[in-house]
Amino acid sequence: MKRLSLTLLLLATVIAFASCEKEDDIVDIPSLNGMALNCVKPAYLKAGDRVALISPSYYTPMENIVKTAEVLRGWGLEPVIGPNADKVYAGRYAGTIEERVSDIRWALNDTTIKAIICNRGGYGTIQLIDQIPLTEWGAHPKWLVGFSDISTLHGLLTRAGVMSVHGTMSSFLAAGGVDATSTLMRDLLLGRVPRYEVSAHPQNIEGQASGILVGGNICTFAPNLGTQADATLGHDLILFIEEVGESMHNVDRQFNILAMNGVLDRCKGVILGEFDGCGSEFSYESIEAMLRQYIEKYNIPLLCGFPAGHGDVNLPLVMGAPVTIDVRGDGATLQFDIDGQRQVVNTADITAPVSSPVSTRMRLAGKSE
């Protein structure tokens, strides 16, 4: 009996030790250290650099990818189209999971490729979260550009310790050509870092804060909690969220999921982007007013109305970068604390050449057909 008890005790000790080792492995991931993370900033692009065009989510017609390639050539860059970029699977996906993973791995591991631009969002990146280890995401730091469903990939890169760009995708470049938004994205990739001057908003909460920028499309970002794409586990975060075409109650639900998982406790500030086409089934003045009621409990600054997301203007943001926001009564500033040539951008001066319906922007992003 004593021998059995001793055996059980030893077994319990081994299990406990193994559990501690596993927990330590999780804690040791560098991107859980918040401001101490210091995500690597990929090298800025230069003339002749190769840029991969891949489709991690919904399919994109080859004609749109080719148009984007022409835009990139006009920027002095060399576009390289992923082998499976225009595949179609199950009516919507850009190929099977295996094909999409293959293109991502090709783009990540080819050291001659210096940046990756995603062709379209939609849905599908959540299927890829556990397909590629974080070490592979961070092995050869390079810029990845996209938004909407691509928010998942931004989370993976932040966890891997690499900055990325929340910005315009191929489907929008092909449809709109070169405008102020895409020009700013080009400038950022080439080393001209924006310092945004943002107009005042009635729902702003004044204050100054610095932290690591995380987030993206809220209905993509929130379900990633607890996965290796969850970039909210550090401290001193600046949370950015945007959405399009969702009901108010779904935005409320996703935000409360973030709050109840402690994300807001780890935030130093919040940035609300575009919420175009989101429902108005409640009598709140706006989605910003609805979300402010939760945010104000944390005594952190809130910057509303930043033109990024699914609107006509989608200004580039550096995810995983240290950022400072200063929200005042007369407006706000957003500054990335990374090296590069500075340029001041007054967001009120940035307009789209042609205003497109919400339905069109949703289709281009892959949020609808």
Language-model segments: which ranges?
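Internal helical hairpin/lid segments
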Residues: 232-287
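N-terminal glycine-rich anion-binding loop in soluble enzyme alpha/beta folds
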Residues: 29-108, 222
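ATP/nucleoside-binding phosphotransfer catalytic cores, i.e., glycine-rich phosphate-binding loops
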Residues: 278-369
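Bacterial Sec-dependent N-terminal signal peptides
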Residues: 17-35
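Short, acidic/small-residue loops that bind anionic groups at enzyme active sites
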Residues: 134-156, 163-169, 301
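Conserved anion/nucleotide-ligand pocket segment
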Residues: 163-226
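N-terminal small/polar loop signature for handling phosphorylated ligands or for N-terminal nucleophile
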Residues: 84-140
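Bacterial N-terminal signal peptides
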Residues: 8-16
